[in-house]
């Protein structure tokens, strides 16, 4: 590649990728790990998972972490975001620590650092320990106490070496999946519980931040949010209002309390009007107010487009946020034909400028961005390399908009692709591939670097393209 970079990034920019414990570790029932909701749900309803592939069959990072981390180094990573499996470290959610799990995470952290890769560590990535789900999960306030204890345990065990912590990844997703739209366990449709889950998750984040600061570990702590911009169909006031309400439900519900310490008035007004306020006390709001994040991870894949409701909602149907807006399919939109998602690269710029203008230009980074492709094997050449030019194009076009945001003063510090190697995408299992590295499940998880991985190495090494 000729090194006439048109897009130069700061020399200390964080280049890397992100992943989560349940999606890549494998070894779901080994070495003392307790069950989480994914292990349990797969056992109960394997037919709901693509090709009946469950969390025990994921990408075997548990056994191959040394080789995988060496590969990260080869692909130019200076940082990598992982998560700790709560039910691996503390099998029942509370109580005894699993020493083998502590050893594993210590080894992974040490190996990353030895390879010049800074570990970014997230505490919760959709994987509630089953023992806690049995008492209600995030609906039950006791889970908040258990989570704070888990967070303190992680800080104590790993905080000497880990200086970038995150309390949650996409906390709105377990709310949507578990309590509104039936794509996570416990598969309920119950808006009252959804609100309680959201509130307790937010409180748990603030309490972990408070604990981290009490422990004086001289790092930074934040949260990772999927900030999908809500674009209205038109400038008609009804469409604009639909966009603002969707934004309050899905973005500002966690963004505002995480960065500003308070919930958006538009959302609170709707919850009061509809009779869905959560149980809480004044001290909870004070803890949320005082314990805002140092650093924000931004996950961005696709925009959300909405319009004013076309029809009156069925009064007997369960209450869902969609009572206030309809999805809008914009004619002529650019699509990822392999995944059914819209590609709108400017969305990442819009998020960063919004954070700059309305959220104090908080220090942030792109913590996930990526392109899932079904049937990626058809792009493998004679040498066995997947020629994923579509992924290179996708990353490049997003990086151009991130670069523009930096030129305009955005405090964005890095870019992590989802994900390093193909991983298990929850109920979609291995249907859509996202990695820089392909994983062949038929050949014992054999790793092969894709064309995009080689390209990314060049970009990271030159901090630009």
UniProtKB/Swiss-Prot annotation:
Induction: Up-regulated by konjac glucomannan and by cellobiose and mannobiose, the possible degradation products of glucomannan. Repressed by glucose via the carbon catabolite repression system. Also repressed by GmuR. Is not induced by aryl-beta-D-glucosides such as arbutin or salicin. Keywords: Carbohydrate metabolism, Glycosidase, Hydrolase, Polysaccharide degradation. The active site is at 170 (proton donor), 368 (nucleophile). Its EC number is 3.2.1.86. GO terms for molecular function: 6-phospho-beta-glucosidase activity; beta-glucosidase activity. InterPro entries: Glyco_hydro_1, Glyco_hydro_1_AS, Glycoside_hydrolase_SF. GO terms for cellular component: cytosol. Gene3D superfamilies: Glycosidases (3.20.20.80). It comes from the Bacteria. One of its GO terms (biological process) is carbohydrate catabolic process. It catalyses: 6-phospho-beta-D-glucosyl-(1->4)-D-glucose + H2O = D-glucose 6-phosphate + D-glucose. The keyword Protease does not apply. Phospho-beta-D-glucosidase that seems to be involved in the degradation of glucomannan. Is also capable of hydrolyzing aryl-phospho-beta-D-glucosides, although very weakly, and plays only a minor role, if any, in the degradation of these substrates in vivo. Belongs to the glycosyl hydrolase 1 family. This is 6-phospho-beta-glucosidase GmuD. It comes from Bacillus subtilis (strain 168). The lineage of its organism: Bacteria, Bacillati, Bacillota, Bacilli, Bacillales.
